[in-house]
Design a protein with these regions (language model features):
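N-terminal export and membrane-targeting signals
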Residues: 1-11
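C-terminal motif of bacterial Sec signal peptides marking the signal peptidase cleavage site
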Residues: 14-17
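Residue-level hotspots at or immediately adjacent to binding/recognition sites across diverse folds
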Residues: 19-383
């Protein structure tokens, strides 16, 4: 009998020692850093009263900008933009529309170059209700002047979307997509944009159908980020495009995963370029240094989209499309959680933007009925 008890005890010990690693205690969750978020107010622009609706924010060379529209009681819109030197005290810019559609523009994207603003706006109209797109640029007197374009430049039969705008050493770049594939619009000064589409690298081809999500200026020219859906497959691949002049583009597919991946936002951080998007079932970064791309770290398990990405405090701040937590990284590899001042709401009617300069970040959250802004100087990462 004693021998049976001993054998049984030995079996218990052996089984205890063979527990699978998955039964081990989970690693402790990092405590989010809590920056000193301060609410920011925007003055209502002159004109009929209405609700502010904001869509984008940007900063460079000591200037901050926010763009959107004013929605009146009847649902009418008019373009609106603001400027600040410290992300706290703001001044409404005077819009100067040059077309009937411009008078009703919703400014959807903002870019900055040498402390000057350029923006993309639109208003649905015409027989088919297609968006009529305009660009806007800062004038010497501080106003924001519409630059009307021929309908086919941004619209026409091949139109799909006109996305984000970025300033760089060679001027301005707008990223978007056409029925032919990816597209870019370039301008040296913002006075007139030229459409570049249906060219090698950007056009859909035997490799698959591309989609561009964002762009950034680099010391050597321009860079676009997005994805490629290979022919016969359902999972996308992360893709970057590079160009010296904005007219000839070279496409490169980056490492992804079996579950699919894409690039949604991109920024320059010092001498590096960092893109963020979805990798499988979470968000992740891809990092370029010295012309070579590599996979960076992952963060935000369960998240599939990032609403904003900005260079802040020598690193980058990413704001997912939904939830109470942002993420900060110094190098794109190790990410730490950052408590946001409010949970980012989900849904198609909401809009979120983030901009950064030095140690300061500006967060814009529009839930479709109310606009809120905050600025903070950090801290952003663990001590």
């Amino acid at each position: 009998m004693r021998r049976g008890v001993a054998v049984f005890g030995l079996l218990v010990l052996l089984l205890a020692g063979c527990r699978p690693a998955s039964r081990a205690a989970p690693a402790p969750t990092a405590v989010p850093v809590r920056p000193g978020w301060q609410p920011v107010s925007l003055p209502v622009p002159p004109g009929a009263p209405g609700r502010l609706a904001l869509r984008d924010a940007t900063a460079c060379a000591g200037r901050w900008f926010v763009v959107g529209t004013v929605v009146d009681a009847a649902g009418g819109t008019r373009p609106a933009a603001w400027s600040s030197s410290d992300a706290i005290t703001w001044t409404a810019l005077r819009p100067v529309p040059r077309s009937p559609y411009g008078e009703e523009n919703l400014l959807t994207a903002a870019g900055c170059r040498d402390g000057r603003l350029a923006a993309v706006g639109g208003k649905s109209g015409g027989v088919h209700g297609n968006p009529r797109i305009s660009t806007w640029r800062a004038a010497e007197d501080g106003s924001l002047v519409e630059v009307p374009a021929e309908f086919e430049v941004f619209g026409g039969a091949d139109a799909v979307n006109v996305g984000r705008i970025a300033g760089g050493p060679r001027g301005w770049l707008i990223s978007g997509n056409r029925a032919t594939g990816a597209a870019a619009w370039v301008s040296p000064d913002g006075a007139e944009f030229a459409l570049v589409s249906a060219v090698p690298g950007l056009a859909a081809d035997g490799a698959g159908r591309p989609w561009v999500a964002d762009g950034v200026g680099t010391p050597s020219g321009w860079l676009l980020v997005g994805s490629m859906l290979p022919v016969g497959r359902t999972a996308g691949q992360p893709v970057v495009w590079t160009s010296a002049d904005g007219r000839s583009w070279r496409r490169a597919v980056l490492p992804g995963v079996d579950g699919g991946a894409d690039l949604q936002r991109v920024v320059r951080v010092g001498e590096r370029t960092v893109a963020v998007g979805r990798r499988g079932d979470r968000l992740a970064a891809w990092v370029e240094e010295g012309g070579r791309w590599r996979s960076g770290g992952g963060f935000g398990a369960g998240a599939r989209a990032v609403s904003g990405l900005a260079a802040v405090a020598g690193g980058l701040l990413a704001v997912p499309a939904e939830g109470p937590t942002g993420w900060w990284s110094r190098d794109g590899d190790a990410w730490s959680p950052v408590a946001l001042p409010v949970a980012v709401p989900g849904g198609a009617e909401r809009s979120v933007a983030v901009a950064g300069s030095g140690d300061v970040a500006l967060l814009v959250v529009d839930d479709g009925s109310q606009v809120r802004l905050w600025s903070a100087r950090g801290p952003w990462g663990p001590a």
